Amino acid sequence: RRGFAQRRKQLRKNLPDDVDWGKVCEKLKFSPTARAEELSLDDWVALTREVDPFFEKEEGQGDDEMLAVVDEDDKVVGSERRDIIHRDGLKHRAVHIFVLNQKGEIFLQKRSRLKDKCPGLWDSSAAGHVDAGEEYENCAARELLEELGLTNDDVREVGKLGAHANTGWEHVRLYATLAKGKIRVPCVEIEYGEWFTMPQIDDWVEAVPEDFAPGFLACWKVWKEANQGRFEDGE
């Protein structure tokens, strides 16, 4: 019933505030009072191309992307293509970011089923490989923008994880930040996302760990250790 009601609303009332509806209508030849139910499939594709900055966005790092190769101590020893690093199990770098809201909830993403690693599993708010020549913190800011549309520049390091099988042989830096602005996700990267309280996540991880990417589970353990007081207080 709610879905039917949304179809009857004027489209401009269902779009983000930053969309210039007048310009969109002028470019796509839409009526300013157009309703969702009045658009054809081609109209919807054209509208998505126009207002969604992530539409047809390619995955942030392809197989030919050059990543830093590191040793056991996380010292850079060279660079290599992403596909070769994964094929040969070379140690490399990655970041995970937990995005929190004012309520203290954490945004988790469900990885797209188009992803080559852990498709359809729940994961950190944002995560990604560190490019060759890139610093961890810069990578965290880039991933926030690419995966969530956030321009946060105040990420805080929470902890470090050494390279091992559970992290995919990645040296990981875990960051946290407070959400600033509305989260917008690219469907090629993320199937779905939702806010959860820390106890909700912890209970879920304990009950059904197979729902989560291994890298997230390793990061969650570090997060719990860094925020033990919150769990003990039942927050």
Segments (PLM) and residue ranges:
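Conserved Nudix-box catalytic region and its N-terminal flanking loop in Nudix hydrolases
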Residues: 83-96, 101-142, 190
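Internal catalytic-core helix/loop-beta-alpha segment
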Residues: 131-165
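A residue-level signal for conserved active-site and pocket-lining positions in enzyme catalytic cores
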Residues: 11, 40, 97, 175, ...
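Short hydrophobic/aromatic beta-strand or adjacent loop that forms the aromatic wall/cage
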Residues: 44, 94, 170-174
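Nudix hydrolase/Nudix homology domain
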Residues: 83, 157-162, 166-235
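Class I S-adenosyl-L-methionine
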Residues: 1-48
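Acidic, metal-coordinating catalytic segment for phosphate/diphosphate chemistry
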Residues: 59-96, 102
